[in-house]
Amino acid sequence: MKKLLAIFLLFPCVLYAEAPKQFPNVSGDVLMQMQADRVISTTKEGVSPNNGFIYIEPNIALNFNRNWSTKTQWRLQPNNVLTTRDSANPERYRTFLQSDRGALSVGQESLLVEELKLNFENDDLRFFAGKFDPTFGTAWRKSKRIGVFASQFNEDYNLREKLGAGITALLEGSQITFNTFMNDTTGLSNSALRKRGVASSSNRVAGNGGALSSYSLSMEGKNLFGIENWFYNFGYRNLAVGKVEGRSREVARVVGSEYLYKVSRDTSLIPFIELVSIGNFGGETGRNARYATMALIGKYSAWTASASVVARTIDQPQTSSKISGSQVQFSIGYKFTDNFTIDVSRANIKEDGNSGALIGTTLSYLYKF
């Protein structure tokens, strides 16, 4: 009788059990964003007041079995707003106070191959090879939702579009990653739709020092020193350059921390800090840079509010001067669903000796499949 009762109780579980995954299969997500911002005031002449653009980021994986897959990331973005080809500032992701702004950047969109890699993963480690973004820092991640502008400011020190390989040790509550790479100067560094051209292999920027002669090491995790909800990240990178006078290896370090303090079931506070020090930024000897991000994020139910300060200082060895930039931002956001959010920000920005006040909004939708 007991056996019959056990079979009866287990039968619905068997009937509705999830069918085993069939391989190969395709999985991933697509981040779609629409951003609009307006320069309220500025000391710089010739700045167009309005700007709007669409950003789309598909992450697609072709899974051969439970361990092996090919992973890709694509970016559809406007070349005149978001770029990595600023000759004066090779690390610059976005110049906020610029004349090339439009109410909607139609016709400026480029489709970039951000990542294209072979990936192996089991319970203990992850190995990948191909084109990828090495890990260094976290303040540039859009998922942080530190307002509209902070992630674009901090993209300056994000490592992007490299060719090489990496391995990650998947530990309990943390992971350690080692990458070895060089800049992508192949045809994959070009773009579809609006062409940006192939990246130069002879422009002497950091990362163009030869095959796999650059590397990075990072550690990211949670529950630091056993304290629940204390998240952290550490990173080191060393980028090679050619043996040319006035050029030296870029060496950088990052340390970041954030703590999730739960006030109640629906309310939490998150203090966040990330500090970055970069020597020979871009490969130029003596061009040293420092970035600091501090934020306080409050969450109540579906609402998010934050105040943040981002500062950068870059030494200019040729003129024995410093270029300082900063961003003070206040933001409020709302999450309609787990995948659909809106953020509105007011920011005071200092950039290249000029200052300005901006207001911006971003609509974000994440489609998973």
Whereabouts are the PLM-identified features?
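Outer-membrane beta-barrel channels and translocator barrels
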Residues: 23, 61-69, 122-125, 171-174, ...
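Outer membrane beta-barrel
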Residues: 53-186
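Residues that define the transmembrane beta-barrel architecture of outer-membrane proteins
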Residues: 47-56, 109-114, 121, 159-165, ...
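Transmembrane beta-strands of outer-membrane beta-barrel pores
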Residues: 34-42, 74-80, 122-124, 131-135, ...
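Outer-membrane pore/translocation modules
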Residues: 108, 134-164, 168-259
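Detector for outer-membrane/organellar transmembrane beta-barrel domains
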Residues: 176-177, 212-322
